Amino acid sequence: MKVGTILTATDSNPLYCEFIPSFVKAWKKLIPEADICIVLIAHEIPDAYKPYADHIRLFPPIEGIHTAFQAQCIRLFYPRQIARDEGVLITDMDMLPMRRSYYTDPIANIPNDTFVVYRDVCLPSEIAMCYNIAHPRVWESVFGSASIEDNFRKIYSEVSYDGQHGGSGWATDQIFFAKQFHAWAGPKAVLDDRVTRFCRLDR
């Protein structure tokens, strides 16, 4: 498998959307052959980010659902829409990559029909959103073909979500992810931090 698209999402919260320039530059330097897709939960691209418009996909906010929730959960469903038939890697808006080999080497010999979870730290009840990769058709196989809005409304109706980092419902995306992943009967690979030599610097 190869990394074909790097996908993340954000709403208009400056705590996250202000990472757009750094995110694009960092990934373009590390994996220049990959496409970058930033799903922006908004009606229009702010002027400050128009230089990066080629990498931004607008998703109009769905009324009645917190935009932070939409930005978190859309990373599970939007990969189905990617046209490029290579791996779609999802990540956080405020996570900047530092080592190319961490992303490319562990998946080099993994078949394209496999869903790969890079980190085993949250299992079994959750799956960390950083990092996971699969081909678009595999994403669809795991998360179904129902519309993004239908999925959002169903999930949102079943949780209490306050939009605060670490607050009520904040891990909904990771909990739902784990539920779908465990129920899926296709080939899976869960990587080990000790083998991939995972390391991060926190801001």
Residue ranges, per PLM feature:
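Conserved glycosyltransferase catalytic-site signature
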Residues: F69-L76, W170-I175
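N-terminal anchoring/stem segment of glycosyltransferases
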Residues: M1-G64
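Conserved nucleotide-sugar donor-binding
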Residues: R84-D85, M129-G144
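GT-A fold catalytic core of metal-dependent nucleotide-sugar glycosyltransferases
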Residues: I74-Y118
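Short beta-alpha junction loops
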Residues: L40-I45, M95, V121-C122
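Well-ordered, non-membrane alpha-helical segments in soluble/globular domains
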Residues: C17-K25, S101-T104, S145-N151, D173-I175
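Short beta-strand-to-loop element that shapes/binds the nucleotide-sugar donor at the catalytic cleft/hinge
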Residues: N112-P136
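Catalytic core and acceptor-binding pocket of nucleotide-sugar-dependent glycosyltransferases
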Residues: V138-R203
